[in-house]
Amino acid sequence: MVIDPRDFLLSSYDYELNSSLIAQEPIEPRHNARMLHVSKRSGEGLKAFHLKVWDLLAELRAGDLLVMNDTRVLKARLKVRLRNGTFVELFLLEPKGQGRWLCLAKPAKKLRAGDCIWMESSGEESIPLKIIDQDISTGGRIVQFPELFSDRRKIEPLLEKFGEIPLPPYINRCDFKDVNRYQTRYASTPGAVAAPTAGLHLSDQFLEALSQQGIKDAKVTLHVGLGTFRPLVEENLANLHLHSEWVEVKEEVVSAIKECRDRGGRVIAIGTTTVRSLEASFLAGDGCLKPFKGEVDLVIKPGYKFGIVDGLLTNFHLPKSSLLLLVSALIGRENLLELYKEAIDQKYRFFSYGDAMFISPEGVLPSARL
């Protein structure tokens, strides 16, 4: 792959999108969303085919392995009361140990170190919290919860009572149905503060049909946080750093991928977070996929050589986002922008509740592989 200097400029990943194409409601059934299939015919460049997510079943073959992110979205948005009776919104990001959590606050200027605040429910139950400090890197606050709620799994019951599902700001509503619809059907490990949105397209019927075709699946965990959804701001991307996110790739996933390779199958990632999980595990093993658990801040951008992932199902992402860099690493930035233009012309729906893009193994640039 020839690297263009423009590949490392944030402005090169901008595009115009009419707000009418930002999906406000999910498609039902899930697998009925549109899918832009990116592939390549012999002797020709990339081609785009307009399908539905259900049609992905016909593009896969027995022996392939679909790898998914099983993180579960927490009800991470909280309204808390200050001593003077006014309210501030907290957005939980990640645990910091001993019941302390990093939170974004809105408006943050109202919260100072030492302040006492209260979570309250409609049942008039109240739980006191305390602002410990400001976090310089994020502009957020370190908030002391009761020490019992020291990790993602332990705090989930509390958030079920006091919190709300953290829909992205471009979705201009909140509905009870989002409690279930903003989760993948296989979400099982609590900890994300945003959904791994490619997986939202996979219905129970789709997963059953997958199994009947002899296509296996495996689950990794990446708790989606700032590293995935925070907008990029620096124009020079050469030394880009992302906020770290917690990842686990278990031994059973490693075994499933090795078996897939042995039978000549292909590894298809469901979502960019799955790509980052697998590739980070591969790099941590010095070029050998091994079980991995820990924080990951891997940046995938043009020039990256993929060691594990052969194909990708993903959504259409926000302008100037790190996710566009990752997809560009697979198919090239100019190809990506051309495909996005076609999707816009064809009125595809964008972002979290929007339509999908499937980059088949044939559509991946040869130079993007090890």
UniProtKB/Swiss-Prot annotation:
It catalyses: 7-aminomethyl-7-carbaguanosine(34) in tRNA + S-adenosyl-L-methionine = epoxyqueuosine(34) in tRNA + adenine + L-methionine + 2 H(+). Pfam families: Queuosine_synth. GO terms for biological process: queuosine biosynthetic process; tRNA wobble guanine modification. It is an enzyme of class 2 (transferase). Its EC number is 2.4.99.17. GO terms for cellular component: cytoplasm. This is S-adenosylmethionine:tRNA ribosyltransferase-isomerase. It comes from Prochlorococcus marinus (strain SARG / CCMP1375 / SS120).
